[in-house]
Amino acid sequence: MSRFMIRAVFFRRYTAATVGKPFRNVAEVKQYLAKQTWSIDEILHGEDTGKAAKQGVPTEEEVRKLLALCAFPVEDADLQNSKRILVKQLSFINKLHETSVDDQDKNLDENYARLLPRQNKALTYDDLLKKIDGIKQDEATGEPTGSWDSTGLAKMRKDNYFIVRQGLLKNRK
């Protein structure tokens, strides 16, 4: 029995996971716990949802156009659910835009702050084409294979702008 307990203690000792730097004293723990944090519920269900609703909930026609633009099925779509999801996404984006992180960036150690680099190289048109070629459409999200070619209508390039002269103007008044 005691041999089993020793194995259990030994096993637990070497399987512990750590995240970030360890705390060195109680003051660091108190300082860490005193920092203001966000709750996802506050962000998505707080006052910002009301702001997004005041800014304008997308109409059913706008939701249909967005679904068609994304090549999702429009006929069998749950428009009310899509509207609710759009309002949540808009409120989350608004919250991110309102948050100032400039003061915090000075003290951040990038090794513990982000998984992606902060400064990224600008993409060129050729880089975008390579990335697009590698994208696989997901049938689970309703994307039919080969439904939309994002660069197929761009026939001309001038001053880093891509000119589309056909296809998109069919249903305009």
From Swiss-Prot:
Top-level taxonomic group: Eukaryota
Keywords: ATP-binding, Ligase, Membrane, Mitochondrion, Mitochondrion inner membrane, Nucleotide-binding, Protein biosynthesis, Transit peptide
Keyword Disulfide bond attributed: no
GO terms (BP aspect): glutaminyl-tRNAGln biosynthesis via transamidation; mitochondrial translation
UniProt-listed InterPro entries: GatF
Compartments where found: Mitochondrion inner membrane
One GO cellular component term noted in the UniProt record for this chain: mitochondrial inner membrane
Molecular-function GO term, any one: ATP binding
EC numbers on record: 6.3.5.-
Transit peptide: first to last position: 1-15
Membrane topology note: Peripheral membrane protein
Catalytic activity: L-glutamyl-tRNA(Gln) + L-glutamine + ATP + H2O = L-glutaminyl-tRNA(Gln) + L-glutamate + ADP + phosphate + H(+)
UniProt KW Calcium keyword: no
Major location category of this protein: mitochondrion
Similarity comment: Belongs to the GatF family.
Function: Allows the formation of correctly charged Gln-tRNA(Gln) through the transamidation of misacylated Glu-tRNA(Gln) in the mitochondria. The reaction takes place in the presence of glutamine and ATP through an activated gamma-phospho-Glu-tRNA(Gln). Required for proper protein synthesis within the mitochondrion.
Subunit comment: Subunit of the heterotrimeric GatFAB amidotransferase (AdT) complex, composed of A, B and F subunits.
Protein's name according to its UniProt entry: Glutamyl-tRNA(Gln) amidotransferase subunit F, mitochondrial
Classification lineage: Eukaryota, Fungi, Dikarya, Ascomycota, Saccharomycotina
